[in-house]
Design a protein with these regions (language model features):
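Short Pro/Gly-enriched coil loops immediately N-terminal to beta-strands
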Residues: 1-7, 78-86
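C-terminal effector-binding regulatory domain of bacterial HTH transcription factors
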Residues: 62-71, 80-122
Length: 122
């Protein structure tokens, strides 16, 4: 999907103070594409739930999109990229807990799995 595919469509969005929302809005502004903002929420999972209920289209991060995909929520590849980062914060003055290393390994494996799922999108 290109930005122009969202023109005039009802759009479900993250709240205006969300950093990912700002990146999305910036892309639409640069392209001069106007969406019809229908509703805003603080959670990407809530955005997906609202789209499932037919309230409009949305752009959300790939982690949430893949987790929410169902027969009522169709994922489509964007013709452009909006970077999304996941960051692990570790203590500066002490070693991390022993559980951190396996958690980071699991996060890395899940990221690779999500990337593979996204490659198969139309």
């Amino acid at each position: 999907l290109g930005l122009e595919d969202f023109a005039g469509q009802p759009f479900v969005s993250l709240s205006v103070d969300d950093p990912y929302r700002r990146l999305i809005d910036e892309r639409f502004a640069q392209a001069g594409v106007a969406r019809t903002l229908r509703v805003e929420t603080h959670s990407a999972a809530a955005v997906c739930a609202m789209v499932q209920q037919g309230l409009g289209l949305a752009i959300v991060n790939p982690v949430t999109a893949v987790a929410a995909a169902s027969d009522r929520l169709v994922l489509r590849r964007l013709a452009f990229s909006i970077p999304f980062s996941v960051t692990a914060l570790l203590p500066l003055y002490r070693p991390p807990l022993p559980e951190v290393a396996p958690m980071l390994e699991a996060l890395g494996a899940e990221t690779a799995h999500i990337a593979e799922q996204l490659k198969r999108l139309a």
